[in-house]
Amino acid sequence: MRTLWIMAVLLLGVEGDLMQFETLIMKIAKRSGMFWYSAYGCYCGWGGQGRPQDATDRCCFVHDCCYGKVTGCDPKLDSYTYSVENGDVVCGGNDPCKKEICECDRAAAICFRDNKVTYDNKYWRFPPQNCKEESEPC
């Protein structure tokens, strides 16, 4: 029961529709976003500041920027629709705003997949005090 409580608390600290984003990461990058990317570098996880530490952290920086450009819906709360066609994730639905959220999540999952080799354990649970440099613009 304690484990379930801990997982519920962790779920509250991740932006977006967590289950959809987690599912996309699993489908595309073939690893758990919750485990690998929820507390990595300066941008993977809740919030973000400073300079991205590597290509994987940059995936999260770009994802944050993408969410920041979404208008007309809430990327942190709204769900979207997608399908898998010929092995590729295709964002769909009639709501262009929700489709944009899906595209942000899809691009991040592809970025994680394409940058698996840059993942460095030294950035997992990276101390926030190491993220004090001025952030670059989106």
UniProtKB/Swiss-Prot annotation:
Cofactor(s) annotated in UniProt: Ca(2+)
Stretch forming the signal peptide: 1-16
Subcellular location: Secreted
Domain of life: Eukaryota
Keywords, comma-separated and alphabetical: Calcium, Disulfide bond, Hemostasis impairing toxin, Hydrolase, Lipid degradation, Lipid metabolism, Metal-binding, Neurotoxin, Platelet aggregation inhibiting toxin, Presynaptic neurotoxin, Secreted, Signal, Toxin
Disulfide-bond pairs as recorded: C42-C131, C44-C60, C59-C111, C65-C138, C66-C104, C73-C97, C91-C102
Subunit description: Monomer.
Protein name listed in UniProt: Acidic phospholipase A2 AplTX-I
